[in-house]
Amino acid sequence: MRGRRLSGPMFDAIAPIRMQRSRGAASVRLGPRGIEDLAQSGSAKAMLPRMTAGRPEIVFLNTAGGLASGDRLDYRIELAPRTQALATTQTAERAYRAKDAPAQIRLHLQVGEGGWLDWLPQETILYDGARLGRETAVDLAPGAGCLLLEPIILGRLAMGETIRHLQLTDRRIVRQDGRMIHHDALALDDAALSRLHHPAMLGKARAMASLALIAPHAADLLEPARAVLDEPGVTGAASAPPGRLILRLLADDGWPLRRQVIRLLRVLRPDPLPRIWQV
């Protein structure tokens, strides 16, 4: 027997099913003696592994497993004066295909006077059709500094995925004592993807990363950083505007990109790499 399409006033009035959206927020405040406040809700979690030496580590996790259309993540870190910490993510963040509203990530990083923060997340992997808007706001008090990393991979390279549709807006703003001292923005859409092979765009690269060191001594590390920009399969450049060291990396694949990032981090910071990176 053939199935029949149900119709009539009762069935015609059924509204389209609305997909459930993921929401997550995690906030950590640290002082010289350790945790002062921790709050988390929804899919966002913040963990602080027990440390025997070095700076405290904050590890963020999105338990939803990735970001789809309309999802939102909010991460916040506040460091008291003279407090140092490292923050990272437990795994790569994934942005899936989105049919309507983009997923959103908001990061607010606040560092007190004389403090220091290393923000070293693992890669963001953008699937074909992903739509993602990310904003990172950093507020530094006088005498504070930070190291910011942002690695991005276009597509699941191991599966041979080609990115044909994408909407990405990614912006980082650093203010010190209320004055903007660093602004970095990236935007990619379908039109930009069609020109990716142009030398002025990404060439054939499918993985990229930016690092920004904000500190009075940043320029002193320019030549040491350039000395290790020789990882096979990676193209890199470094510059040192006043009070900053900026590095850009392009690679055909995520693995050589990660190897180059690790080599740079060993030059730019005295402490060991995040333990979660070694898992």
UniProtKB/Swiss-Prot annotation:
Domain of life: Bacteria
GO cellular component: cytoplasm
Keyword Cytoplasm: yes
Major subcellular location class: cytoplasm
Cell location: Cytoplasm
Parts of the chain that traverse the membrane: none
A molecular-function term among this protein's GO annotations: nickel cation binding
Keyword tags: Chaperone, Cytoplasm, Nickel insertion
Subunit and interaction comment: UreD, UreF and UreG form a complex that acts as a GTP-hydrolysis-dependent molecular chaperone, activating the urease apoprotein by helping to assemble the nickel containing metallocenter of UreC. The UreE protein probably delivers the nickel.
Function (record text): Required for maturation of urease via the functional incorporation of the urease nickel metallocenter.
Similarity-based family: Belongs to the UreD family.
Designated name of the protein: Urease accessory protein UreD
